[in-house]
Amino acid sequence: MRLFFLRHTSLKVEIDVFYGQTDLDVSDNFEEEVILIKKKILNFNIDTDSIKVYSSPLKRCIKLTNTLTENYIIDERIKEMNLGDWEMKKMTSIPEREKLEWENNLLSFKIPNGESNEEFLKRLKSFL
């Protein structure tokens, strides 16, 4: 079995902002980025109508998926990480104590009102 993962295109969001599961729209470069993605898919000889395609329910993912195929399955488990209180905040606005704890415990640190990397990975593994 071969697996291919696509990440969504660029988003309408400031640089250095944690956006996680916030349902942001794609940037104005969407069409150009889709052309590049389709070219890469062609290089792998993938017929998107004859394979199973899964998408996160976030609109940035659905929008890209709709340009590739009409037949896809939406799965909540492949959403971005839940960044809780860090959603839509710049790194500079995250309390130093939380940043330090995050840096020292990358796997187990749970973002306040969000999820830890460990929880995120467990969710993704349940998809696979």
Where are these regions (language model features)?
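Active-site-proximal alpha-helix that buttresses catalytic centers in soluble enzyme cores
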Residues: 6-68
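Short amphipathic alpha-helical segments with coiled-coil-like heptad repeat character
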Residues: 39-40, 100-104, 127-128
